[in-house]
Design a protein with these regions (language model features):
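Surface-exposed interaction/gating patches
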Residues: 1-17, 98-103
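Glycine-rich beta-strand-turn "strand-cap" elements at beta-sheet edges
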Residues: 11, 32-51, 57, 74-103
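Short amphipathic alpha-helical segments
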Residues: 14-38
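Short amphipathic alpha-helices within nucleic acid-binding modules
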Residues: 16-20, 58-71
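Residues within well-ordered alpha-helical secondary structure of globular protein domains
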Residues: 21-24, 68, 81-84
Length: 103
């Protein structure tokens, strides 16, 4: 199992609007291809940031799922709606430690 921690920094003052839009439009699409572990809003550090953690079986699974997602016509239509909100995006891949309950 691998986890992708994907952080979106959004335009100041637009975080609530971004989350509402993502929940209504983006989440139903991407959830077909990845399992959402959780979504958080940063309260310290780099503000105006939302962190999603997605689970995949392994890197090959993530790669294949993202390839299919990138061809999904609903996702393709959604991307231009999301981009104006974004200032920065970062993805970090993590594997669970041997004692982690999330394996």
């Amino acid at each position: 199992m691998i986890y992708e921690m994907r952080t979106y920094q959004v335009q100041p003052g637009k975080a609530a609007e971004f989350l509402k839009m993502y929940e209504a439009k983006g989440l139903p699409i991407i959830s077909r291809y990845a399992r959402l572990i959780g979504c958080w809003v940063k309260e310290s550090g780099v503000l105006n940031s939302t962190v999603f953690i997605w689970a995949y079986d392994d890197f090959a699974h993530r790669t294949s799922q993202r390839a299919v997602l990138s061809k999904d016509q609903e996702w393709i239509a959604f991307i231009p709606e999301m981009l104006p909100y974004l200032v920065h995006q970062e993805s970090v891949f993590m594997t669970p430690a041997m004692f982690s309950p999330n394996k």
